[in-house]
């Protein structure tokens, strides 16, 4: 009788543990609109400090634009390119600078350049919190991808204390 009770207890404990870990939903972290705007403002301030007129976009973890700002003399194309850089970084889970190298002609991943919205030039980075990507930032309009990257990094740094990087 003891064996049956112990077996039943073990079976119930196993079933309870499985029931707790098997769910139909998943909880994720997302940037608030206030955090997205804070990052956009910081990135733009850094670009202005360097003398660049740019557009800055922040997208959520799904690539949907949360905040977008174009400086008054930034080119008409820069808001779209900034949003596409942020989208590319989030979608491919890596910086656009790294993707630029990995997708050069002759590389196995060069076909990615034909994906709509793919932007393989520096200036797109990811926000991470607790080991998960929670959004991306894209900057367009500085004279190089490296300069765009430096401004995007300022946007990420502005949220460093708010995110568990």
Name each model-derived stretch.
Residues 1-4:
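Positively charged n-region of N-terminal signal peptides that target proteins for export
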Residues 10-11:
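Short, linear, compositionally biased motifs with a strong N-terminal bias
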Residues 14-16:
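N-terminal signal peptide c-region/cleavage motif recognized by signal peptidases
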Residues 20-165:
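Flexible, solvent-exposed loop/hinge segments and secondary-structure transition points
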């Amino acid at each position: 009788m003891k064996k049956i009770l112990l077996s039943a207890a073990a079976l119930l404990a196993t079933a309870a543990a499985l029931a707790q870990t098997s769910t139909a939903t998943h909880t994720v972290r997302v940037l608030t609109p206030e955090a997205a705007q804070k990052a956009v403002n910081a990135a733009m301030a850094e670009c202005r400090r360097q003398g660049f007129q740019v557009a800055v976009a922040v997208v959520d973890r799904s690539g949907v634009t949360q905040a977008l700002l174009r400086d008054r003399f930034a080119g008409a194309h820069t808001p779209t390119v900034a949003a596409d850089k942020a989208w590319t970084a989030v979608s491919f889970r890596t910086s656009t600078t790294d993707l630029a190298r990995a997708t050069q002609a002759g590389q196995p991943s060069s076909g990615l350049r034909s994906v709509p919205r793919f932007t393989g030039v520096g200036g797109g980075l990811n926000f991470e919190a607790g080991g998960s990507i929670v959004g991306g930032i894209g900057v367009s309009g500085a004279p190089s991808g490296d300069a765009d990257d430096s401004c995007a990094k300022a946007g990420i740094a502005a949220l460093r204390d708010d995110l568990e990087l």
